[in-house]
A protein has these predicted regions:
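Conserved short beta-strand elements that form part of the metal-binding/catalytic scaffold
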Residues: 8, 12, 16, 55-86, ...
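Vicinal oxygen chelate
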Residues: 40, 89-133
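N-terminal beta-strand motif that seeds the catalytic metal site of vicinal oxygen chelate
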Residues: 7-45, 72, 86-88, 138-142
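Short secondary-structure junctions
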Residues: 53-59, 108-113
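Terminal peptide-recognition signature
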Residues: 48
């Protein structure tokens, strides 16, 4: 599927430019972040803000987001204070559809999206064709 980047059209039309719109293939990605785990959420958020000059975008005991240099670090609560997996996370509107696109493009589905807390699925674990793990998430309501 090819999508036109409409913001590009609106911006350039306002400037009087007639450049054709950008087109790209692929799923809609709402946010890209790198996710880590923390045993102590407050300590982790304070660390990334103090050491790297981060700005808190969202914070609770389940998931917090800290912006650093136009990137986002997702800090997931429930870590055990030891080295754990971290990973590239694409926030998409629909993890089931996103996982299907990854599989159709030669990737793998490592963990089926499951409903949780009376909400639609919010997580799919996938891998690219080279085996690199990718998380697809949907923004949760809480």
């Amino acid at each position: 599927m090819i999508r036109t980047v409409t913001g590009y059209i609106e911006k350039n039309s306002a400037l009087g430019k007639t450049t054709p719109p950008l087109q790209r293939e692929g799923m809609i990605v709402e946010r890209l972040k790198y996710v880590i785990w923390a045993a102590d959420m407050d300590r982790a958020v304070e660390f990334y803000c103090r050491v790297f000059g981060g700005t808190v975008l969202r914070q609770n005991q389940v998931i917090s987001e800290v912006s650093v240099a136009n990137g986002v670090i997702g800090i997931h609560g429930g870590g055990e204070g030891t080295r754990t997996w971290t990973g590239l996370n694409f926030q998409v509107p629909d993890v089931i559809a996103g996982a299907a696109e990854i599989v159709a493009a030669g990737g793998l589905l490592l963990r089926e999206p499951q409903p949780e807390d009376n909400e639609p699925p919010h997580l799919a674990m996938c891998a690219d064709p080279d085996g690199n793990e990718i998380m697809l998430t949907r923004r949760r309501t809480h």
